[in-house]
Amino acid sequence: MKQTVYIASPESQQIHVWNLNHEGALTLTQVVDVPGQVQPMVVSPDKRYLYVGVRPEFRVLAYRIAPDDGALTFAAESALPGSPTHISTDHQGQFVFVGSYNAGNVSVTRLEDGLPVGVVDVVEGLDGCHSANISPDNRTLWVPALKQDRICLFMVSDDGHLVAQDPAEVTTVEGAGPRHMVFHPNEQYAYCVNELNSSVDVWELKDPHGNIECVQTLDMMPENFSDTRWAADIHITPDGRHLYACDRTASLITVFSVSEDGSVLSKEGFQPTETQPRGFNVDHSGKYLIAAGQKSHHISVYEIVGEQGLLHEKGRYAVGQGPMWVVVNAH
């Protein structure tokens, strides 16, 4: 398995393309100059395209991915109704979902043969919309509205329209600020990192019809932490055994172990990392974690070790200015 790591740096308007080898070392293979401040990125389900959101002209760009080395070639673009904060796709590669924090909306862009062709739906009134996350069964779009302490739930129709489910939302504790999410591989649990109180909620998906319950909330910060809480990102290993979340004020990655059924998180430790880690990701082997420092302009690679999933630094690399997004593609 070959793996390519993409790093988005909006301040220098670049995507750095790296080869990740089996020992966790990175080799720079390409630097792409992007026509705008590039932030969120996602790889298409068929691994043929990288979709990126840019501003100040709000667009989604599609780059064709070379199957041999992961190199990028521009392919298409489509306008967006707000500054892109988070980007994702459905599992069949029919739609791109874009959450916009500043516009307070989530939009759906239709794909034709992998290329974006236009917005088919927009839902407004999502104050602080920070991500759009399709459920493992491809039925429900989870959309955290950070400033409203709620996660809105939409059914995605065959033509890409969003229809509120029943119930239409779940709520967090007041002041939590739900931000980013991941799902357990068993498809029965979701995990949401809350920005404003730096906690992680565990949501049980009791049935496919929207019956959802928060079964655990865990503080992700050290006991003696007294500064402003400012959590950012969350990721889980492919085997579902280890979960990670980061805080930008503390420049810290919190390590969690996950119970076998996915229902319980246990805090295992903390890893100091790059300054102001806005984004990170786990590779497809589940052996390595790559974190980007928005203020350090570097990335660090960590090996995931032991039963606890603790992090051991393998290498550090300079990238563009203000790196914010990390995506790993296996090919």
UniProtKB/Swiss-Prot annotation:
Protein name per the record: 6-phosphogluconolactonase
Function (record text): Catalyzes the hydrolysis of 6-phosphogluconolactone to 6-phosphogluconate.
TM region positions: none
Disulphide-bonded residues: none
Catalytic activity, EC: 3.1.1.31
Record-listed N6-acetyllysine modification sites: K287
Assigned GO CC terms: cytosol
Superkingdom field: Bacteria
Annotated keywords: Acetylation, Carbohydrate metabolism, Glucose metabolism, Hydrolase
Pathway(s) it belongs to: Carbohydrate degradation; pentose phosphate pathway; D-ribulose 5-phosphate from D-glucose 6-phosphate (oxidative stage): step 2/3
Record HAMAP family: 6P_gluconolactonase
Molecular function terms from GO: 6-phosphogluconolactonase activity
Broad EC category: hydrolase
